[in-house]
C-alpha cells in the first residue's frame, strides 16, 4: 500500500446524547411504508443496491469538494438535502449552499471565528430552522467561511427547509449484524444516510484515493480525525456500503467509495446516523445550474493547500 497522504481537514464532531432527538427505526414493515415520488421502486440488482439509480443526480453533486475547510458535515448534509429534493419533486431545483450551512452550524455552536467543524445534529437543525440558500447565491469560497451570508441568502433560504428529519435508533440492535441490516433497511426505504466515522491513516493513502476501496483499519493504525459522509447504497458481494465523500470527483470512484459493513456498523467507529425525510418545494428565482462555477464545487486537493489564512 502507498501510504503517502494528502493534506485534508475533516470536521466531524461526534454528538452527545440528546433526548430531544427525533428517532426512527426501520424494520421490514417500514420498507413497504415509504414510497418514492420518483415512481421507481428501489431494487437490489446482482447484489447491489444504489440509490443513485432511482433519481437523476447532477454531476455537480459528485464534484463537491470541501477543500481545506472542516466542513464535511455541511457537505454531506447538502448532498442528502439535494437528493431528497430531487427524489420528491423529480427535478433539480437548486444546489444547496454548503458554506451557508457551515456558517449556521458554527453560529449555533458558538464557533463562528474558527474552522471548528460541527456536529451532524447541528447541521440538520440549521436547515430546519434557517433553511438553505442556493450555492450560486452563496458560493463555496473557503476564504469566506467567517463571513455571514447576506440577508438575501437568508430570505431565499426560508423557502428551502427540511421539514422532517430523524436520527436512526439502533437501541434494539444487539449485534453488528443487526446494525448492518438496519442500515440497509434505511437505504432500501429510499434515504441516503449522513453519518460520521473515525478516520485512520490508511484512509488517506493514495491507494484509497485512486480506488475508492476502504479496508478495516489495522490495529497499529493511528486515529487521525472524524469525518462526515453520506451512504447511498450497499454491495452484498463485497460486503460494503457505497458512500459519498466530499473531496471532489477525482477522489475515489467519482467522489464515492466503498466502506466495509463492519466499519460502518461498529458503534466505536461510526455514529450519528441521520436522514432527511422531507423537504419543502423551493422555487428559486433565476436558477440556472450553469451559473455555478465548477471551480467553486470541485476545489481539488491543491486549491488552498497551504491552509486558509485570515487577517
From Swiss-Prot:
SMART domains: Pept_C1. GO terms for biological process: proteolysis. InterPro entries: Papain-like_cys_pep_sf (IPR038765), Pept_his_AS (IPR025660), Peptidase_C1A (IPR013128), Peptidase_C1A_C (IPR000668). Belongs to the peptidase C1 family. One of its GO terms (molecular function) is cysteine-type peptidase activity. This is Uncharacterized peptidase C1-like protein L477. Disulfide bonds: none annotated.
Amino acid at each position: 500500500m502507498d501510504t503517502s497522504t494528502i493534506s485534508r481537514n475533516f470536521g466531524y464532531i461526534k454528538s452527545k446524547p440528546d433526548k430531544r432527538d427525533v428517532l426512527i427505526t426501520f424494520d421490514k414493515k417500514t420498507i413497504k411504508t415509504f414510497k418514492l415520488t420518483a415512481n421507481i421502486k428501489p431494487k437490489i440488482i446482482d447484489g447491489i443496491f444504489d440509490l443513485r439509480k432511482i433519481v437523476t443526480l447532477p454531476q455537480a453533486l459528485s464534484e463537491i469538494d470541501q477543500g481545506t475547510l472542516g466542513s464535511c458535515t455541511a457537505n454531506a448534509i447538502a448532498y442528502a438535502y439535494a437528493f431528497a429534493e430531487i427524489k420528491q419533486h423529480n427535478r433539480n431545483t437548486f444546489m444547496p449552499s454548503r458554506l451557508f450551512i457551515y456558517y449556521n452550524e458554527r453560529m449555533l455552536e458558538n464557533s463562528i471565528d474558527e474552522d471548528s467543524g460541527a456536529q451532524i445534529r447541528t447541521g440538520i437543525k440549521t436547515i430546519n430552522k434557517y433553511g438553505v440558500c442556493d450555492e450560486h447565491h452563496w458560493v463555496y469560497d473557503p476564504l469566506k467561511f467567517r463571513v455571514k451570508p447576506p440577508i438575501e441568502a437568508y430570505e431565499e433560504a426560508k423557502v428551502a427547509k427540511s421539514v422532517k428529519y430523524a436520527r436512526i435508533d439502533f437501541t434494539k440492535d444487539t449485534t453488528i449484524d443487526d446494525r448492518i441490516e438496519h442500515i440497509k433497511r434505511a437505504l432500501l426505504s429510499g434515504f441516503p444516510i449522513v453519518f460520521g466515522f473515525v478516520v485512520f491513516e490508511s484512509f488517506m493513502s493514495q491507494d484509497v484515493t485512486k480506488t475508492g476501496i476502504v479496508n478495516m483499519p489495522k490495529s497499529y493504525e493511528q486515529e487521525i480525525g472524524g469525518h462526515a459522509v453520506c451512504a447511498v447504497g450497499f454491495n452484498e458481494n463485497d460486503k460494503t456500503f457505497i458512500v459519498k465523500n466530499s473531496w471532489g470527483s477525482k477522489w475515489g470512484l467519482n467522489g464515492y467509495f466503498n466502506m466495509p459493513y463492519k466499519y460502518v456498523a461498529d458503534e466505536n467507529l461510526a455514529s450519528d446516523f441521520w436522514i432527511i425525510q422531507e423537504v419543502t418545494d423551493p422555487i428559486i428565482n433565476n436558477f440556472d445550474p450553469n451559473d455555478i462555477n465548477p471551480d467553486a464545487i470541485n476545489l481539488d486537493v491543491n486549491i488552498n493547500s497551504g491552509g486558509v489564512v485570515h487577517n
